[in-house]
Amino acid sequence: MAIGLKQLKDYCGRKPGSHAGSPFGEGNLVFKVCGRIFASLHVKESPVKITLKTDPELAGLLRQTYPAVRPARYFDKRYWSAVTCDGGLPEDELLELIDTSYDLVVRGLKKSDRASLRELDPR
């Protein structure tokens, strides 16, 4: 079963410090943490596509395994992948990719920004 737009918005929006906006026009909904993009939803496409930051090795493996995962347009193709949300990638793996994207972006933030995020979500 394919994950829907509402589920994707809700999941990305629940990440600590997550803010949504449309800096590229109303066809894209971008989720940022501390001003850095971790997910870009292509909301006018059907099925919906989401662009996520990925580890380069994992990206290569995912692209070989799942036709729904491709290099992202307009982003560095080594680090960013576009996922077509048509059920071609299992939902649990897609949610894990969102988590990974968020974590990779947070890892690249300044120490003070990471500390403020830990206050929001002290896990």
Where are these regions (language model features)?
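Charge-dense, helix-prone N-terminal extensions
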Residues: 1-123
